[in-house]
Structure formats: structure tokens, C-alpha cells
């Protein structure tokens, strides 16, 4: 049960934070596109 090969020493909370920001960014772009009319057909 060693941590060898698990992305170095990056803490789990940091990975979760970055992943959350990326998800919010993608969702924000999607809704912005829908609001702008690019995806209004949805």
C-alpha cells in the first residue's frame, strides 16, 4: 500500500478543487453558448 506512482505528492483536495473548477468552467461555457444562441435549440 505505497503511494509510488500516484501522481507524486499532490494532495487529494487540490485535485478535487482543480477538477471542480474545470467542470464549472465547462458548464459555464456551455450555458453561455446556450444563452448566446449557439445552443438555444437545446
UniProtKB/Swiss-Prot annotation:
Protein's UniProt name: Photosystem II reaction center protein J
Gene Ontology CC entries for this record: chloroplast thylakoid membrane; photosystem II reaction center
Major subcellular site: plastid
Role noted for this protein: One of the components of the core complex of photosystem II (PSII). PSII is a light-driven water:plastoquinone oxidoreductase that uses light energy to abstract electrons from H(2)O, generating O(2) and a proton gradient subsequently used for ATP formation. It consists of a core antenna complex that captures photons, and an electron transfer chain that converts photonic excitation into a charge separation.
Bilayer topology annotation: Single-pass membrane protein
Transmembrane annotation, as ranges: 10-30
Gene: psbJ
GO BP, one annotated term: photosynthesis
UniProt similarity note: Belongs to the PsbJ family.
